[in-house]
Regions:
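Membrane-interfacial terminal anchoring regions of lipid-handling membrane enzymes
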Residues: 1-191
Length: 191
C-alpha cells in the first residue's frame, strides 16, 4: 500500500522454497514472489539458471526485494548476512546489465514477535514446524489477537557505483577480493 501511495513499483520478492505450499505459494507467486532453494551446492545448473534470472531482473530494472539475512529473524535479533543472492546481484551489475544497483535497507520490527512461542520450543530441542496448510490453519488464532505496533524504517540508499569509488574495479578483483567486497557490501546494508 505504501509503495502504491508513492507511485513505486511493487518488487519481485526472493522467497524460500519452504513458502511454496498450497494455497499460499500461488498467492505469493501472484504477488511477485519467486522461490529459491536454501542451497545451490552441487547443482551448477540451478545456480547458473538462477543467476541468469537475477541478471534479467536487473536488466529489466525490476525492483528486487530480498532478505539479506536469508530469512526472517524469529528471535527479533539481527542475524549474519547471507551473501549468495547478493553476490549474484553484484555479478550481474559487474557484467553491465544495469548501470547501477541501489540497495535500500528496510527495517521491519515488531512490538511482539509472533513466533516467540515456537522459537522457544525449538531452543529447548523441539523440531521446527514445517510451513504448510496445516500450520496456516493453526495460525488462524494469531489473527484474532493484537500484538502491538509494526515499525518500518527506510535507511539511506546504497549505490554500488558510489560504494566502489576509490576501490579496485570489480573486474580486476580475484575471488578472495570479491568475497571481501561481498562482506563489505553486506555489512554496509545491515548497518
Amino acid at each position: 500500500y505504501t509503495l502504491f501511495q508513492h507511485w513505486m513499483s511493487v518488487p519481485v520478492v526472493a522467497a524460500g522454497i519452504n513458502l511454496s505450499f498450497f494455497p499460499l505459494g500461488t498467492v505469493f507467486r501472484k504477488g511477485g514472489a519467486f522461490f529459491m532453494r536454501r542451497t545451490f551446492k552441487d547443482n551448477p545448473l540451478y545456480s547458473h539458471t538462477f543467476a541468469a534470472y537475477v541478471r534479467t531482473i536487473l536488466q529489466e530494472r525490476i525492483p528486487l526485494e530480498f532478505f539479506i539475512e536469508g530469512t526472517r529473524s524469529r528471535s527479533g535479533k539481527l542475524m549474519l548476512p547471507k551473501k549468495g543472492l547478493l553476490s549474484m546481484i553484484l555479478q550481474g551489475w559487474e557484467s553491465g546489465v544495469t548501470r547501477d544497483v541501489i540497495f535500500v535497507p528496510v527495517y521491519v520490527g515488531y512490538d511482539t514477535v509472533v513466533e516467540e512461542g515456537s522459537y522457544i520450543r525449538e531452543m529447548k530441542g523441539a523440531p521446527k514446524e514445517k510451513e504448510g496448510l496445516w500450520s496456516l490453519i493453526k495460525a488462524g488464532d494469531v489473527l484474532k489477537n493484537r500484538y502491538g505496533r509494526v515499525y518500518v524504517r527506510f535507511s539511506k540508499p546504497l549505490s554500488m557505483n558510489e560504494f566502489m569509488k576509490g576501490r579496485p574495479a570489480y573486474s580486476r578483483m580475484d575471488a578472495d577480493q570479491k568475497e571481501l567486497l561481498y562482506d563489505s557490501v553486506a555489512q554496509a546494508i545491515i548497518s
